[in-house]
Amino acid sequence: MNKDINIAAIIKNEIENFEGKIQNHDIGKVIIVGDGVALVSGIEKVKFGELVEFENNVLGIALNLEQDLIGVVIMASENSVFQGSIVRRTKSVISITVGDQLLGRVVNALGIPIDGKAELDNSLKSAIFTNAPSIMDRKSVDRGLKTGILAIDSLVPIGKGQRELIIGDRQTGKTTIAIDAILNQKGKNVYCVYVAIGQKNSSVAQIVSLLEKKGALEYTTVILAGASELSPLQYLAPYSGAAIAEYWMNKKKDVLIIYDDLSKHAIAYRTLSLLLRRPPGREAFPGDIFYQHSYLLERSAQLSNDKGGGSITALPIIETQAGDISAYIPTNVISITDGQIFLRDSLFNSGQKPAIDIGLSVSRVGSAAQTNLMKWASSSLKLNLAQYNELKAFAQFGSDLGPSSQLILDRGNKIYEILKQENQYPLTERQQIMLLILIRENLIDSLEQKSIPLFKSAFLKYCDSEPKFRDKIEKMDYNRVLEPNNLAGILKDITDFIEKFNLGNVF
């Protein structure tokens, strides 16, 4: 009897202390699934860009909000989602792991490591889709970001916080310029993010290997959404990269981000939009493709001092077809960015590397970030090249040229030889200024064109190894033009070196 009373008392006590916790879940059902997209009914309160969870813990993103159906892109193989599957709202937007732990790592578009190294600490996360800094949170670009490439730093300079497009046909050296820019940030306290969209895994593996070999991977994060990845992951990759870069920018750091390339990103978004049955527009791209790219690139900025003064410098890459920069996506991105570096395949095939078309390349804000000394040294370069290109076109008609015209042609050929540069060998600002002084003061006129490569190599070695001359160079103030006396001393040393070189006394 007592035993029955005890059991009854225990049950009564459990009932009195029971706290019923009711969990509400917004759930729906998959109506149609195919090609990586599911149409779902029953979760009408879902937000745009919200994560939803299918059975088997498969995630998707709500990208189409209609009256009765929700268009969801599936973030895994569509074989794991079936018609009739249950879908649950997560009430959270997609986010990615951020922080210094990502330096030296290779991750996918969701922030999951794919380099075989240790797992990441996921306690620090940031939303992939965030708003760009407001106008009041920014300031004008006034600090230079050196690429180490003479033709770029002198003619189309890039500033921290700028968006500079690299555009050209395939196999013209677009990625090479971007990677060289990353290599040149070593020791400059600039973090780098390289986003590979639709690239071959083998090509990205070579890039990662090069960065590691050159000691650049330690300040770089690589995000890979390869050609074999699903369209949703290729679409998300650049926004993931921007979120990672924004974390560092808000921590008062300077960041360089490469989007390689936005042509493939546009194709991935077009694929998604057509599968979601959105109306196609020009070249079958959806109507909001301009918004997608402007929303992405506007997240690159130079923050004001009140916001910490951090920056994101973006180098988006666009691939053209047969040099057509008037196509839809190229014109879109050209109008969004602060300038473009146009690479021409004819220049590349003729051996001019980097194959930059000076006439079509421009930097709209970068000159404000150049030092006064660099501005002075490069002031006559663009004019010399413009005169050369004009005369070169005229000379093709077989007209007889006077001595002055022939001098301009010869000088232009030599300038282009000076501008040639091997990849993975960036030049310091001092080295660039010394080469530009050669051009500015017409000292290359006494050299033969075929001897320019050998002369350039010997001259740069002389600048670094001759103690007295090196002291003069190191005393140059980048914020001021050269004093006449200092310039005269430097020119005398250079002239003496050229005379020795022409006599064959320099090896």
From Swiss-Prot:
Name of the protein described by the UniProt record: ATP synthase subunit alpha
Principal location listed in the UniProt entry: membrane
Binding site for ATP: G168, D169, R170, Q171, T172, G173, K174, T175
Enzyme type, top EC level: translocase
Enzyme Commission number(s) from the entry: 7.1.2.2
Species in which this protein is naturally found: Mesomycoplasma hyopneumoniae (strain 7448)
Domain of life: Bacteria
Summary of subunit composition and partner proteins: F-type ATPases have 2 components, CF(1) - the catalytic core - and CF(0) - the membrane proton channel. CF(1) has five subunits: alpha(3), beta(3), gamma(1), delta(1), epsilon(1). CF(0) has three main subunits: a(1), b(2) and c(9-12). The alpha and beta chains form an alternating ring which encloses part of the gamma chain. CF(1) is attached to CF(0) by a central stalk formed by the gamma and epsilon chains, while a peripheral stalk is formed by the delta and b chains.
